[in-house]
Amino acid sequence: MSRFKLTLEYDGSNYAGWQRQAKLHTIQGALEQAIFRFSGQQLTITTAGRTDAGVHATGQVAHVDFIKNWPPHTVRDALNALLRQQSEAISILNVENVPDDFDARFSAIKRHYLFKILNRRSPPALNAKRVWWIPKPLNAQAMHEAAQKLVGQHDFTTFRSAHCQAKSPIRTLERLDIQKEGEEIFIYAKARSFLHHQIRSFAGSLMEVGIGRWTAQDLEAALHAKDRKRCGVVAPPSGLYLTKVEY
């Protein structure tokens, strides 16, 4: 068996998330279909991050084991051709051989996410499924300053889904920066791992700061409350991107 590491991007708008589900269109299902057509093997592809329905990726990482040691460029080009035939919004950016002990999920040491907000009065006509449109003016500087209250090791119970299956709500957030570029506001997050809906919960709560409804102290109080009910609105998946995985 030969293990291959795949780096890929996808538009998650029309998928029911990464994880294979019966009768639903998923990223994993589409990839495994292409892999079967290429290799004749019924294989399971393992990913660094099982993104939710509607979430995108520009730097997702996965691994798969083939019986044959194909040249990496052959795997990339063949899978991309098959994905195009299947009309999938998925592209394999890079393929490389890796040792058998490499695991796309468990070998990862950092995950980077980006959340995009379109902040203008007019709604988006072109990228409606790739941003969170907020027509009210946002104070990006206030959002950035408040976000620093969340950086570090904390119990993030307030900012995780009630359905989160993680054993512990404690995570170490290494970066949470907010930058404004023209009509867009970008939220950059980095950690070894994240809780279910954590970044979308951050984005929704920071929106409350941006419109002036919350202060930085309100955000900090919500964090320390360790109470899901204290979270702001959960932002939609359309603005969220997995951008990079470090190993």
From Swiss-Prot:
Keywords: Isomerase, tRNA processing. The active site is at 52 (nucleophile). It is an enzyme of class 5 (isomerase). Belongs to the tRNA pseudouridine synthase TruA family. HAMAP family: TruA. This is tRNA pseudouridine synthase A. Its EC number is 5.4.99.12. It catalyses: uridine(38/39/40) in tRNA = pseudouridine(38/39/40) in tRNA. Disulfide bonds: none annotated. It holds the Pfam family PseudoU_synth_1. Substrate binds at residue 113. Formation of pseudouridine at positions 38, 39 and 40 in the anticodon stem and loop of transfer RNAs. One of its GO terms (molecular function) is tRNA pseudouridine(38-40) synthase activity.
